[in-house]
């Protein structure tokens, strides 16, 4: 068992015995003796129960499995979370997909320990349904409902004695799982369910049990979520699991006081996984997400890729797509890494598969909207003229530095001259890859998995040839840029010379969607005209723009290729500079910026215009002329590139968005990069140390995210506490070993963890996906073993 990264090392406790206070009914070779270790009783009881009843318990990555639809239960399954995957050496993705059948309530109980403490509640979608004999059972589902956990006989609540594991599971859940919502326990009688048990207590634990008529359920209050109590409960579960829970039950319809029911004592075994828990003030971050972004808090990003690979997938392409046979495995061995204890719903890095790549192609590269309604060819020269009048100073232009180009050709030698003499080289062919880290959502209410992104790029020697040319053109562009226009290149620029203050100013921001794939022939030709006027050598300029008119994108690893026209290539030499020029071209035309005073900030597709009066423009030109979907952001805010532009001591300073930092606090990090991660954090938050900024930022956060200033201030204070020392920063990380990728190793871990008991463990694995075969994760047996 791995220790944590901070001073308090975790020492696994020695396994203890579990004693059974139950009175077994009928003849049973395992009649309870309080002096005998209960593990053996558990095994024997489970063997007897399942031998006679022939019941299976299914742990599955599917919420539904037809083989297990028996009796009154419509569903038997467990939707796994990442915390089950943190089981040392055990991970369903290591099997390549599929399900695990077990027939031991002890295995069932240990799996339950591994899943539920990793969540603040079961409301995140966890389903745990256990069916026992006699039509009774225990159910944990997405609504925090326990069904048929008790038998009600002769006016008394009685634990099921036929299955010790079931009683233990019920006791563990009731005592140690925090209750963010009302929990109901349905009591099944021989006739029909007649009542419910509502459990609630202000601090999130259960102190009393009473019967409530089903019609009165609406009157039962919902308990609040107390994060500090959640942390305490989880810590007790994993470090000091030794409960004795007394339920004082009273019957509202019989008037009799039911006898107290004592749950068995249970001591944890070393196989119970150590889940990283927020400590101290880190719990305030969880509280912030629970209160203001519950969807982020409850989201389980670790299952996103699994869901993509297991679900059906349909996509239409308006262009021809070439698919080739390739072996692929979306689960790959990862290095040792540190896991954050803060639940922010941050997406896991994507692994390139055919499904992910096809989804990225369909969303990012093909199917561009066709909204242009005006002739385009006649506008090229006029748009270029307006661009120069609006953003660049007049005079001082020449045709380029001939000495620079001569030196460039001389240094590049034979490679460059071979290109010059081989104009028909296939430079229209691009390589393509999937971007592993996508843009995550900052919407507090509706976090969704971001659309996957592709990166298209040339081979290294092509970039080596064209990069110096574009650097020279950019240098000429910046040397003639107007003083009231800022284009950040490298670190964020000093805005004080442009904007002394935002007070009393009107801010205009345009959100441009589908930016890369919507760029068509008009913007392509206007860029070419601008580059030529900036001194780009004509032969090289014509060549560059020629192989951007129609390109062939190829992913050699996944065997996917297709063609695109005109749109921006996201990884070529001029991506950032070209996107910035496109934004400036459109803004100058739509708002006629050459005829009014303004200050402007442009960076890629991000933009911010500052004027004395509200800006009026022909917004319809975005779709009708430029084929671009655009949304005017009102009211505008001094926010740009995920940074607030704050006025401090008469200077405009870019300050990173604390909420984005909080969101990224849920990221995991490889151990070898942890120190670099901390240094990057210090550099990114250096502007937050100023008192003026820390006073201003909570007000800006409250306006943007609709939270109170106190809540924003607490979040900001927590970020600043991480700057105090590296130890303080590392406290919300925990070490986790890499998942084993060997089936034999996994089998060994199963047997060592669960003991040498007569458990039937069957593992299925789906066929490797390709464009000719369908995944069948439930019917293809890969390995079967019995110990």
Curated annotation (Swiss-Prot):
Question: Could you tell me the EC number(s) of this protein?
Answer: 2.7.7.48
Against PROSITE patterns, the record matches this protein to: RDRP_SSRNA_POS
Matching Pfam families, A to Z?
RdRP_2
Q: Please list the GO biological process terms of this entry.
A: DNA-templated transcription; viral RNA genome replication
Q: Which reaction does it catalyse?
A: RNA(n) + a ribonucleoside 5'-triphosphate = RNA(n+1) + diphosphate
Q: Is Ubl conjugation found in the keyword set?
A: no
Q: State a single Gene Ontology molecular function.
A: RNA-directed RNA polymerase activity
Q: Per UniProt, which keywords does this protein have?
A: Nucleotide-binding, Nucleotidyltransferase, RNA-directed RNA polymerase, Transferase, Viral RNA replication
Is this entry keyworded Chaperone?
A: no
Task: Enumerate the spans annotated as RdRp catalytic domain.
Answer: 505-619
Class in the EC hierarchy, top level: transferase
So which domain of life are we looking at? Viruses
Q: What does this protein do?
A: RNA-dependent RNA polymerase which replicates the viral genome composed of 3 RNA segments, RNA1, RNA2 and RNA3.
Q: How does it assemble?
A: Interacts with replication protein 1a.
Similarity comment: family membership: Belongs to the ssRNA positive-strand viruses RNA-directed RNA polymerase family.
What is this protein's record name? RNA-directed RNA polymerase 2a
Q: What is the lineage of its organism?
A: Viruses, Riboviria, Orthornavirae, Kitrinoviricota, Alsuviricetes
